[in-house]
Amino acid sequence: MFKITVALAAACTLCAQVKSPDLPAPFATPDTANPGKMVAKPEAAKLIVPAGFTVEEYAAGFQKPRYMLQGVSGEVLVTESIAKGNVLVLTDSGKTRKKLLEGLDRPYGLAWHKEYLYVAEATSIKRYKYDVKAMTAGTGEEVVSLKGYDKGHWTHGLAFDAKGEYLYISVGSSADHVIGDPEDRATILRFHPDGSGKAIYATGLRNAIGLKFAPKSNEIWTSVQERDHFGDDLVPDFFTSVRQGGFYGWPYAYIGPHADPRAAGQRKDLVDSTITPDVVLPAHAAVLDFTFYNGKAFPAEYRGGAFLAFHGSSNRSKRLGYSVAFVPFKNGKPTGPEIGRASCRERVCYPV
């Protein structure tokens, strides 16, 4: 049996496409507000997993847990993304926990760089010296200020390249659709580890949440939540490698050169240059983070591929998401729809 340890997870069938899909016209179906409601976990509720796999709960009882990072000694760090949020350290197979950091402004992304733990808050990126043995953190040092960028999409993914030369940060847009955001919103930014040398690495990314380098590669990947209010099947979320200098559509186009009617006639140059993402996901499924699998416990077809977490829709007539899906890779490229997923009945749980 293959064991999946689930700390935060969860429902619905998803189909990822690795070629440009046939998209419906905008407003082919009505814009629908259909949010799920958090309910208590039913007594008999359990995650549904592919044949041959089992699932066990690692830890529970968090306040809006949004991100996990494994430490060098096997500890697991978890961010609680509330107004005065925390970074927790879990040890002893999730049975023991302590607050590493507290009183943070909606902490989200985490990353290691040498002796430092980097933490993304809504308006700031800070680094803390981390004591590996004691599992404690020193005083925070702000390396990047994002003051004023806490409106709209405030979560920030963090990633370092393999050599540790650059820090990459995702910065979402200020709204679902707006023209006139600062040029460094809806982007992936690049800095030196000390916060100097700011550069815009890629643009047109409405809400890039997950941010990681592929194994044995200098290729950065991101998971992106796309815009709303075009109907059930527009605009698809996506999962893609990111080209330096690339433009990915927002707010003028989407999924390649499909012009957004709300920006009709504007920036045809950008519309025409919009990159089609590697993997197109269902619209409004709310993809969050992802992780590449490099272990040996699962069958060979899982190695090198990516697990994606889908939080679930809030504006589709038929709800979608609530699952953890897997996209297989071969030679560093995605090869097809997911081959397995962990899911549960909608609204019982929400993966992050």
Predicted segments — roles?
Residues 346-352:
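Positively charged, low-complexity/disordered segments
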Residues 97, 101, 106, 111-113, ...:
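Asp-box/WD-like beta-propeller blade repeats and closely related beta-sheet repeat scaffolds
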